[in-house]
């Protein structure tokens, strides 16, 4: 096994050679551009997402004309049902609710209300 002094000298020589090689490439690039490969350009950002347009979607679908004509009316009716469900939930009697939904996994009445509101936000 070589001594520590020998290892230090070998390491210093390798380090000096690496530095010299670096300067050689820098000088060669300055004299003759194109010797080194060009740097990799940064990735281009993705194009902005187009906002969802329900009317445009309905035009592209192959649904029957009757469905296309009435889809907005049906969507409004569904929205009305959901909003009335929320209002009904807010006015619901706590004891009646807990009596009807015993064993459904609701810890409290407020827990059930919060779960229902989360469900409505998702859909």
Curated annotation (Swiss-Prot):
The keyword Transmembrane applies. The chain crosses the membrane at residues 5-25. Keywords: Host membrane, Late protein, Membrane, Transmembrane, Transmembrane helix, Virion. It is a single-pass membrane protein. Residues 35-47 have a biased composition (Pro residues). The keyword Transmembrane helix applies. Residues 33-54 are annotated as: Disordered. It is found in: Host membrane; Virion. Induction: Expressed in the late phase of the viral replicative cycle. GO terms for cellular component: host cell membrane; membrane; virion component. Belongs to the asfivirus CP123L family. This is Uncharacterized protein CP123L. It comes from African swine fever virus (isolate Warthog/Namibia/Wart80/1980).
């Amino acid at each position: 096994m070589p001594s520590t002094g020998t290892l230090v000298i070998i390491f210093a020589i390798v380090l000096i050679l690496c530095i010299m090689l670096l300067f050689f490439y820098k000088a060669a690039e300055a004299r003759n551009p194109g010797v080194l490969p060009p740097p990799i350009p940064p990735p281009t950002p993705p194009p902005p997402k187009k906002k969802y347009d329900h009317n445009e979607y309905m035009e592209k679908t192959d649904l029957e004309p009757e469905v296309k004509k009435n889809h907005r009316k049906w969507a409004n009716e569904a929205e009305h049902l959901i909003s009335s469900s929320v209002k009904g939930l807010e006015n619901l009697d706590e004891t009646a609710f807990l009596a009807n939904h015993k064993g459904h996994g609701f810890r409290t009445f407020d827990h059930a209300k919060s779960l229902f509101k989360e469900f409505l936000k998702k859909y």
